[in-house]
Amino acid sequence: MNSRAKGVRGELQVAHLFQKSGYKAERGQQHDGRSGHADVVGVPYIWIEVKRDQDLNVLKAIEQAERDSAGYYERTREDLLPVVIHRKNREEWKCTMRLLDLLSLSGSMPFAVAVPTDGLVTMTWSDWIRVYMAYETERSGA
């Protein structure tokens, strides 16, 4: 399968996961027909990078998401937390983000504690979406 088609399918699958959780998610390219958006849009506060790769370098993927979300911030002043949602063939979806970003989502960031900023955390989709939904509900005041 060519990698572009595999990428599109992955983005559609992730958008569907968010839709099943109640979000109006869609592919970023589909959103306006051009680049400059996350791979999946319609999820508040999050920059989503989707990867389907057997040999994924997660650190490089996070760095790409950080660069792209920083560029988006420069254009829009909307600050989004970068997350990479990824899977290998026949495995479940996983979510990886910086530890500091995850702690800001979970609401358990003690300001007096120094945490290495290069620390990455990977968790299953089901665990991550529970943390994210609690954060989003609290932040939106719903």
Model-based region annotation:
Residues 1-142:
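Catalytic phosphate/metal-binding cores of nucleic-acid and nucleotide-processing enzymes, i.e., regions
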